[in-house]
Amino acid sequence: MKVFSFTVVVVMILSLSAFVLAGDEGDVMKKIVAMEEAVEERACLAEYQKCEGSTVPCCPGLSCSAGRFRKTKLCTK
């Protein structure tokens, strides 16, 4: 969770810097949203990879299925 918080802070600092330096606000906002979504997706995949017997659901767009050795279930596309 600390890595996620640190990553979000870094993304926000970079986003604000890009916003100040850029002339076109529309493009900057699209890039900021894309970066934040990518960070959230990576954090979600890192934290919620195993899904069998867990109360935490898989990330959006993923489903719980048997893993490679079928001992555990993993969130996969």
UniProtKB/Swiss-Prot annotation:
Keywords: Disulfide bond, Ion channel impairing toxin, Knottin, Neurotoxin, Potassium channel impairing toxin, Secreted, Signal, Toxin, Voltage-gated potassium channel impairing toxin, Voltage-gated sodium channel impairing toxin. One of its GO terms (cellular component) is extracellular region. One of its GO terms (molecular function) is potassium channel regulator activity. Residues 1-22 form the signal peptide. It is found in: Secreted. The keyword Plastid does not apply. Residues 23-42 form a propeptide. Disulfide bonds join 44-59, 51-64, 58-75. Expressed by the venom gland. Its main location: secreted. Inhibits Kv11.1/KCNH2/ERG1, Kv1.1/KCNA1 and Kv1.3/KCNA3 voltage-gated potassium channels and Nav1.7/SCN9A voltage-gated sodium channels. In vivo, intracranial injection into mice causes lack of coordination for 10 minutes, followed by fast recovery. The presence of a 'disulfide through disulfide knot' structurally defines this protein as a knottin. Belongs to the neurotoxin 02 (plectoxin) family. 04 (U16-lycotoxin) subfamily. This is U11-hexatoxin-Mg1a. It comes from Macrothele gigas.
